[in-house]
């Protein structure tokens, strides 16, 4: 358990504004007076680009190996292939902003986020833009049981998506 706890601390130290590593699940089959012979951990890693993701993976492997040497344990690191980083095409962003301004659709530029979505696969093959549709205050947080968006936002979302598509194909 001590080795696992130390590894979690080392992994957390990797966090910067450009990358996040977190362990959200730890399982150990011990008891109050029995030190477990195995500890299983799962976590997530988020970055803004694939180059940084590869670097974080390399650092995780290094930290695990150093931790193994310090504690006399063996760590098996396994990375489950996840979604690629969501990267917006700068030209599509420019076009979307211009369309929103021209059409009087309110918008707000958000700071970069480490979005993990299957949409990231599209951006690896085609110019793509991932945007969020504001659904009003009090809608609750996304991916929670309290999320209750205002349905009146849907027509605006449909209209904006149609405008983006028409603009893209008419250029």
Task: Annotate each PLM feature.
Residues 1-88, 113-120:
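Midchain, well-structured core segments that form catalytic/ion-binding scaffolds
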Residues 3, 59, 95, 156, ...:
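Charged catalytic carboxylate motif
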Residues 55, 88-91, 149-152:
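Alpha-helix N-cap and loop-to-helix initiation/capping positions
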Residues 60, 64, 100, 161, ...:
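Hydrophobic "lid"/C-terminal helical patch
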Residues 86-99:
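Short, low-order "capping/linker" segments at domain edges
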Residues 105-171:
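Zn-dependent metallopeptidase/amidohydrolase metal-coordination segment
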């Amino acid at each position: 358990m001590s080795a696992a706890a130390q590894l979690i601390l080392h992994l957390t130290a990797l966090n910067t504004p450009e990358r996040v590593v977190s362990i959200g699940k730890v399982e150990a089959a011990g008891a109050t007076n029995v030190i477990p012979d195995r500890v299983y951990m799962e976590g997530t890693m988020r970055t803004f680009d694939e180059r940084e993701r590869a670097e974080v993976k390399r650092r995780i492997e290094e930290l695990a190996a150093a931790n193994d040497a310090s504690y006399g344990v063996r760590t098996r690191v396994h990375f489950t292939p996840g979604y690629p980083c969501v990267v917006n095409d700068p030209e599509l962003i420019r076009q979307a902003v211009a369309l929103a301004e021209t059409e009087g659709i309110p918008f707000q530029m958000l700071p970069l986020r480490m979005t993990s979505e299957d949409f990231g696969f599209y951006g690896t093959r085609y110019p793509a833009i991932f945007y969020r549709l504001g659904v009003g205050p009090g809608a609750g947080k996304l991916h929670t049981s309290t999320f209750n968006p205002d349905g009146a936002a849907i027509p605006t979302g449909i209209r904006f998506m149609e405008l983006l598509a028409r603009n893209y194909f008419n250029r």
